[in-house]
């Protein structure tokens, strides 16, 4: 446990940041889940709308370091591929 006042303050700040970052990570997962649900339901319009909403959030979290930039790129690429497959299957 932290003994000095500065260490106590840092521990408090770290806990505050950890919980905030956890909520941001959860938000990203929710946006991704919304896209996946729309894809599973084979609803192209809803999937595209959810993807359009998710991309800026994913990018913002990657810029902030909440998730790694490669993970953000991987999510966007895979979701985009699924939507493209859905659109070609629907056509």
Swiss-Prot record:
Biological processes per GO annotation: translation
Keyword field contains rRNA-binding: yes
Keyword field: Ribonucleoprotein, Ribosomal protein, RNA-binding, rRNA-binding
Molecular function, one GO term: small ribosomal subunit rRNA binding
Entries under InterPro entries matching the protein: Ribosomal_bS20, Ribosomal_bS20_sf
GO cellular component terms attached to this protein's record: cytosol; small ribosomal subunit
Segments traversing the membrane: none
Annotated spans, Disordered: 1-23
One Pfam family cited in the UniProt record for this chain: Ribosomal_S20p
Basic residues: compositionally biased ranges: 7-20
Superkingdom of origin: Bacteria
Record carries keyword Electron transport: no
Signal peptide span: none
Role according to the record: Binds directly to 16S ribosomal RNA.
Family as reported in the entry's similarity comment: Belongs to the bacterial ribosomal protein bS20 family.
HAMAP family: Ribosomal_bS20
Listed name of the protein: Small ribosomal subunit protein bS20
UniProt source species: Pseudomonas paraeruginosa (strain DSM 24068 / PA7) (Pseudomonas aeruginosa (strain PA7))
Taxonomic lineage: Bacteria, Pseudomonadati, Pseudomonadota, Gammaproteobacteria, Pseudomonadales
